[in-house]
């Protein structure tokens, strides 16, 4: 459970209805931005969540390129909100547990890399660079 790549496995609440609602919330977030989870993985898998975050960044870049600054701001806000509500806390626990509780070389290194990346983003802020160039403010 400590190294499960699923967000819901890191929550203290194991109620099935709570977990079902959390998965529905994630899928709703994805659908709101035109992404549907069609893989064999659940919506709370780290690969699904990181794919969604990268998708939001891509949409933001394309919106900026096309001069759609309102849409760009929506993507920025969604990225920040998703990271805060659905990703950062559990991903940090997952990264630290992977770095310290898995045997071998690759996964502990990957866990440390993720942990450092999350700490860097927390320190500098996910939108530090983007907000500096934001033409809507």
Label each PLM-derived region with a short phrase.
Residues 1-137:
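Surface/interface-facing alpha-helical segments and adjacent flexible terminal/loop regions used
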């Amino acid at each position: 459970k400590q190294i499960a790549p699923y967000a819901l496995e890191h929550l203290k609440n194991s109620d099935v209805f709570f977990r079902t609602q959390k998965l529905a919330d994630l899928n709703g977030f994805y659908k709101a931005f035109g992404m549907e989870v069609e893989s064999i993985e659940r919506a709370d898998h780290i690969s699904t969540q990181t794919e969604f975050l990268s998708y939001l960044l891509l949409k933001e870049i394309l919106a900026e390129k096309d001069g759609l600054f309102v849409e760009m701001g929506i993507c920025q806000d969604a990225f920040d909100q998703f990271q805060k509500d659905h990703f950062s806390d559990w991903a940090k626990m997952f990264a630290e547990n992977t770095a310290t509780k898995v045997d071998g070389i690759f996964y502990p290194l990957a866990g440390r890399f993720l942990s450092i990346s999350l700490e860097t983003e927390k320190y500098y802020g996910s939108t530090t660079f983007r907000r500096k160039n934001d033409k809507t403010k």
